């Protein structure tokens, strides 16, 4: 079953309205837009989805809406991670109920948990997911949890774990993980090194910028399948030009602004305390949206 999880998975954004409430209609349009651009699946409720500034009820509502739009059409992975094991279990149960294909969880953070506590946290979530495969989410830059290679090797061999989302620039470690676990589904997490991650052994990727240019990442996959490394590098360079701009604007708010100009997202706002895009970047983001729409067409 784990091999069905391979591919290009957009880390789904969560649209909000001017009152900072969930914009369900924009969310539905965004799901349909992603399906239309040919991505293999959605990773719902993660960092890109601003999960950690949402209530548990809101996170469940997002899962429900996404399932209504996409279940059976593409692979659906629910990120259910929180600092609380009980809350993560509740979200895992919801993911199972709504028909998701897998669950994922970031390592619990903020408190200095022992490694055995991390393992127990994952075991509990896996139990509540009732048969859904687990995607361990390693993102040390945001979680503050610096797992060693030995600890990663232990986590990915827990019963019920089928995949790892490796959001790290350490490509040597990516290759070490692949060598140690040839059957593990391994996702590259940093969009700017997607092609390099595939060459280091990743099966696919989970990324935020796939929301606006998923076809480019699919093109990188296809180029490498055909042995055309030069084409993969060219496509990665084009992606990275976009990422350069988004880093300046703030990635999530920049993506929402581009999608607003594409008529996908009604309001290009993140949830506070994240601020709106600086107006000086709006012309560049509008031009990017136009460029991508023409390219997609």
Curated annotation (Swiss-Prot):
It holds the Pfam family DHDPS. GO terms for molecular function: N-acetylneuraminate lyase activity. SUPFAM superfamilies: Aldolase. The keyword Membrane does not apply. Aceneuramate binds at residues 47-48, 167, 189, 191-192, 208. The keyword Secreted does not apply. It catalyses: aceneuramate = aldehydo-N-acetyl-D-mannosamine + pyruvate. One of its GO terms (biological process) is carbohydrate metabolic process. Pathway: Amino-sugar metabolism; N-acetylneuraminate degradation; D-fructose 6-phosphate from N-acetylneuraminate: step 1/5. Its main location: cytoplasm. Belongs to the DapA family. NanA subfamily. This is N-acetylneuraminate lyase.
